[in-house]
A protein has these predicted regions:
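Positively charged n-region of N-terminal signal peptides that target proteins for export
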Residues: 1-5
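Hydrophobic alpha-helical membrane context
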Residues: 15-16, 43, 115, 228
């Protein structure tokens, strides 16, 4: 009897777990970098924190509209400060499937660069990669007691980054694939210079327990790049590219998808509006033709009547002239 009860309970547990897994929504965490008193990099006309938030929210809109089955979580949706560790904790508590952090690059005064690049967690292969990681990680110095929180990690010391050389794990391969998808789609779709996919020691990525990547949208310290990153149309192009890179990744790895997701509808010009405008234009043309057709007919009739009247007058005049000539 005890064996039967145990078997029944085991089967019930399996059914519950299966149902839970089947009903579980794919969870994406979008992380707009910086915020609040942490402005991030500064440009001549804007702050990094605002650019990051603008692109992140637009990217999220594409996901929410085209993938309603995806649960989208933002680490922030307003101008507030969120510690790096808490950003990762938000993703870990939600048992997220993917973590994408959105940032904007910068260079010291006098240097110019352009382009879009994507990072995954790992040991930097070049000094430029280390510089980017150091700049992004320096935000922890704004957190109270950060030495204890991050176990003595010093974002300004290159020695602290040696630990990233030994970080591997099951998430590495998928993170790199996600980064490559996003890099390819944004650079081709938004016509951005391709600065490639790199690895570097980002604390926010180290603390997450799922595949993740960090995006650098462009260089806020380069004048034309900053203008581009503040242009609503270009922001939409970039957000759409990020979405399409994410969709390509999900089509491959989310086994619950029966029909692959296609490219997103354009945010700025909805498809329904295009169809509606076309129909309206056709109706207007038909109405115009209907109005102008009678006028052309009347004019033709008037012209014919005038010609006939002129012919009759000429005939009468000829008849009157004949006796005089005789």
């Amino acid at each position: 009897m005890l064996k039967k009860i145990t078997l029944i309970l085991t089967l019930l547990c399996m059914l519950v777990l299966t149902a839970t897994g089947a009903n579980r929504r794919f969870t994406l965490v979008i992380d707009p970098g910086h915020g609040g008193h942490d402005a991030g990099a500064l440009g001549a006309i804007s702050k990094e924190k605002n650019i990051n938030l603008s692109v992140a929210l637009q990217f999220g809109k594409y996901v929410e509209r085209n993938m309603p089955d995806v649960r989208v979580i933002y680490t922030r949706k307003t101008d507030v400060f969120i510690p790096l560790k808490e950003r990762a904790n938000i993703a870990n508590r939600a048992n997220a499937d993917l973590f994408i952090s959105v940032h904007t690059n910068a260079l010291p005064a006098g240097k110019i660069a352009r382009g879009f690049e994507t990072y995954t967690l790992g040991m930097h292969r070049a000094k430029d990669n280390l510089d980017v990681a150091m700049r992004e990680n320096s935000v922890i110095s704004m957190e109270k007691g950060y030495q204890q929180t991050y176990q003595g990690f010093d974002p300004r010391s290159s020695e602290s980054y040696i630990i990233f050389e030994f970080i591997q794990g099951k998430n590495m391969e998928r993170s790199v694939e996600l980064a490559r998808n996003i890099q390819r789609k944004v650079c081709s779709g938004a016509n951005r210079p391709d600065k490639g996919v790199h690895q570097a020691g980002f604390l926010v990525l180290r603390e997450t327990s799922m595949p993740s990547c960090l995006i650098e949208l462009g260089f806020i310290t380069t004048a034309d790049e900053e203008r581009l990153l503040n242009d609503a149309s270009r922001v939409d192009d970039i957000a759409r590219g990020i979405y399409e890179g994410f969709a390509q990744y999900r089509n491959k790895y989310d086994k619950s998808i029966s029909v692959p997701y296609r490219a997103a509808d354009t945010e700025s010009v909805p498809v329904a509006k295009i169809v509606s405008d076309t129909k309206q234009e056709k109706d207007e043309r038909r109405a115009e033709e209907a109005d102008t057709a009678p006028r052309r007919t009347v004019k033709q009739v008037e012209t014919r009547a005038t010609k006939a009247k002129t012919v009759q007058q000429n005939r009468r005049q000829n008849q009157q002239d004949k006796p005089a000539q005789q």
